[in-house]
């Protein structure tokens, strides 16, 4: 596998297409998950988990930035609010070969709020603008923002428009809009993905009012048919948990959303391509479940799906030969 690291010389890449992307998801979109998803779609833009500026600047940056060359197009999502720190991290991302740097202005968790990260920054548009400008001044890699449509106490359209307008003035040209407000007190991150109502109409108003900006819609999208419908209004769509729990949805993204004439990869073909990656990971001292935990949804809707999940989530931990257990699971999806 060809790994790119922070020491890999940066080569200029074209601006990535954001027509279809998989959202940054904590504990889920690690490098193993992204390698697997890339086997299903060549065109999808993939995002890392959010990485804080502190993690990159005060720990082993290589551990957070390393990725396989096949993962491109690939964006790094940063969490932070100190412009100089974000600029330094953007430089690390550019040196490591990332295709985009994205600032998290959408995460509602208490833990990140306490560090001035995530959705709480929607109350500070001038600071977000300063952060974006610092990153743009530091790198040629595209800098984007992912945000909510508001936060409790600051949820009017006028305030959202002011936020986008100020950040646009700092040079940001692409905004990914999670079409819910974030409730910063009293709701868990999970509840913040479910309880505040989806307001696609507000995101659509942003696109009408800022026609020069790229507006990518996120939140509650579950099918490629829905993606097609939203693409009549928006420049791109981003899927989160649906893409993780039902990853085979990605297998037809290239054909349906990008017009590719490449054959659709089967589930068993994707797993056959994943096997050498698993072997290499284990030979380097890693555990099989680091990879296989991300593929449990691949059998969704098939007879034998429960057995598939059991083999890969429980039986591999007890097996003397975990690769043999993986092969058993693959057999359940042969020809599918």
Curated annotation (Swiss-Prot):
Residue sites binding FMN per the record: 24-26, 77, 146, 178, 218-220, 240-241
PROSITE patterns per UniProt: UPF0034
Entry keywords, A to Z: Flavoprotein, FMN, NADP, Oxidoreductase, RNA-binding, tRNA processing, tRNA-binding
InterPro entries, per database record: Aldolase_TIM, DUS-like_FMN-bd, DUS_fam, DusA, tRNA_hU_synthase_CS
GO molecular function: flavin adenine dinucleotide binding; FMN binding; tRNA binding; tRNA-dihydrouridine20 synthase activity; tRNA-dihydrouridine20a synthase activity
Residues at the site labelled Interacts with tRNA: 104, 190, 193, 306, 309
Reaction equations catalysed: 5,6-dihydrouridine(20) in tRNA + NADP(+) = uridine(20) in tRNA + NADPH + H(+); 5,6-dihydrouridine(20) in tRNA + NAD(+) = uridine(20) in tRNA + NADH + H(+); 5,6-dihydrouridine(20a) in tRNA + NADP(+) = uridine(20a) in tRNA + NADPH + H(+); 5,6-dihydrouridine(20a) in tRNA + NAD(+) = uridine(20a) in tRNA + NADH + H(+)
Family that this chain belongs to: Belongs to the Dus family. DusA subfamily.
Name of the featured protein: tRNA-dihydrouridine(20/20a) synthase
Keyword Oxidoreductase: yes
Gene3D superfamilies: 1.20.120.1460, Aldolase class I
tRNA-binding among keywords: yes
Active site residues according to the UniProt entry: 107 (proton donor)
Enzyme class: oxidoreductase
Cofactor section: FMN
Enzyme Commission code(s) on record: 1.3.1.-, 1.3.1.91
Lineage: Bacteria, Pseudomonadati, Pseudomonadota, Gammaproteobacteria, Pseudomonadales
